[in-house]
Amino acid sequence: MKDITKTVADSFSGSSKLLFPKHMNNEGILYGGQHLMWLDELAGIVAKRHCGNEKQRVTTACIESVDFYKPCYQSDIIDMQGFITYVGNSSMEICIETYTGGFCDNKTLVNRAYLVLVALDDNGHPVTVPRLNPASIQEKERYEAGKQRSIIRKNERMFVLEQGDK
């Protein structure tokens, strides 16, 4: 699968949610955990689309960062947009941005998250994923930033594993 190349647009996915009381905490603000579940689901869809197979097994390996900029309230409609930013051998970094204000031209960014998912075979072992061909300047910048985050993650993982041996 590694010899296949995909674009960011090939796996772009979106999801909209109308927020109900069951999604709210006691302050009337969207539960962070509920939002995380939706982010993880959308990231899985993006990853499967990048692999080109809706049956492809993928798993969340890392939630790199989740930044909540503004709260979301009951009756808000949130729009989540997910896209690939970087791919390794078997891993895919996915950015998801969440907006409110979907009925007007001035959407407000309320959340940005980076998740890393890994493609797995039927035995749970990592498998190669298609390469990513970033087309626009913004996609190329995101790719390079994702590459740097991947290097940092690998170094941190090696450090933790080495510490466990002591």
Regions found by a protein language model. Name each.
Residues 24-37:
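A conserved, well-ordered hydrophobic junction motif at loop->secondary-structure transitions
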Residues 1-2, 62-68, 79-81:
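Short structured motifs
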Residues 2-9, 13, 73-77, 85-166:
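HotDog/MaoC-like acyl-thioester-processing domains
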Residues 22, 26, 122-123:
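Short, ordered coil/turn segments that flank beta-strands lining enzyme active or ligand-binding pockets
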Residues 14-18:
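Active-site-flanking beta-strand signature of metal-NTP-handling nucleotidyl enzymes
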Residues 54-74:
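Small beta-barrel nucleic-acid-binding modules, principally OB-folds
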Residues 34-54:
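Active-site helix/loop of acyl-thioester processing domains in fatty-acid/polyketide metabolism
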